[in-house]
């Protein structure tokens, strides 16, 4: 399935939240499914980059996805809008978040536990109020690097910025990949080059940096999902440090932890079938 075919098969819809703002999403209601997944993309913020995951999961689940839209200025406002949409759709969901999506999942779950069945978080960090000194310092380095990157956006041509982003992904993430795995990453980068705009990239940097305002979460915030949290933390992920990973494990109640899904920070893209099998098995085992 191509991206164009995906968009025709799963057209976008809109919902007006109580603030009057429009929320755009893609939703497939599988009549045979007993669980619904919300796919929360990483820091690029383009949910269509997960179109193969959407199509793969649609065989077993109902699936919902969306971008981190410009009209929602911070994580809290966005989480509240997501909860409104879920109540409108009459859905209680598994939040499946990658990287920044894992952070967004924590904000949604802590603010609106009534719409959440469980969490699947991959190659991400915690919003713990009790994170280690090393973990906190490592996260703040990521946030500060994003603030510096936003300054580049002010004076560098955006086509050059996108080429730099593509080069960084292909250079850093594909060492040792098979030709098929490199092709998957090339496809991802091609879609990113097509879809990403300068205003949205600026918004995504602000959205990521805003996450520091939600530090302070405790294990009690996630107590409703004891035994219903899957953490996929690739050993070869160099974006989040071991300290960040340990802080996340410590925050979650009795999580299942998988570390051997290799492929770096974007392992779920290059190991799609292995990733999908892990997630599907975990959720179906916990679905009556």
Residue ranges and their predicted role:
Residues 119-152:
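Flexible "cap/lid" loop of the alpha/beta hydrolase fold
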Residues 97-101, 105:
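Gly/Ala-rich beta-loop-alpha elbow adjacent to hydrolase catalytic centers
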Residues 238-244:
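Conserved alpha/beta-hydrolase "acid-adjacent" motif
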Residues 225, 231-233:
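Short beta-strand/loop motif that positions the catalytic acidic residue
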Residues 239, 263-276:
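Catalytic histidine-centered segment of alpha/beta-hydrolase-like enzymes
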Residues 21-72:
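Conserved HGGG/HGGXW glycine-rich cap/lid loop of the alpha/beta-hydrolase fold
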């Amino acid at each position: 399935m191509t991206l164009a075919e995906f968009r025709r098969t799963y057209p976008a819809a809109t919902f007006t939240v109580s603030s009057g703002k429009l929320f755009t999403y893609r939703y497939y209601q599988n009549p045979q499914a007993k669980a619904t997944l919300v796919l929360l993309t990483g820091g690029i913020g383009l949910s269509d980059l997960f179109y193969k995951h959407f199509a793969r999961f649609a065989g077993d689940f109902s699936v919902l996805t969306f971008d981190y839209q410009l009209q929602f200025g911070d994580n809290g406002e966005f989480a509240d809008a997501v909860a409104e949409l879920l109540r409108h759709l009459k859905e209680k969901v598994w939040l499946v978040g990658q990287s920044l999506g894992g952070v967004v999942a924590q904000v949604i779950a802590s603010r609106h536990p009534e719409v959440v069945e469980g969490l699947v978080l991959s190659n991400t960090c915690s919003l713990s109020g009790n994170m280690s000194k090393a973990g906190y310092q490592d996260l703040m380095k990521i946030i500060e690097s994003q603030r510096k990157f936003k300054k580049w956006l002010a004076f560098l041509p955006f086509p050059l910025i996108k080429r730099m982003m593509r080069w960084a992904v292909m250079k850093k993430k594909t060492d040792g990949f098979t030709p098929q795995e490199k092709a998957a990453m090339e496809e991802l980068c091609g879609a990113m080059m097509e879809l990403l705009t300068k205003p949205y990239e600026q918004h995504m940097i602000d959205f990521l940096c805003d996450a520091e305002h939600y530090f302070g979460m405790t294990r009690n915030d996630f107590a409703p999902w004891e035994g219903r949290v899957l953490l996929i933390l690739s050993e070869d992920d160099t974006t989040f440090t071991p300290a960040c990973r340990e802080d996340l494990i410590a925050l979650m109640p009795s999580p299942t932890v998988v570390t051997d899904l290799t492929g770096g920070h974007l392992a779920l893209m290059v190991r799609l079938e292995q990733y999908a099998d892990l997630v599907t098995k975990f959720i179906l085992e916990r679905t009556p």
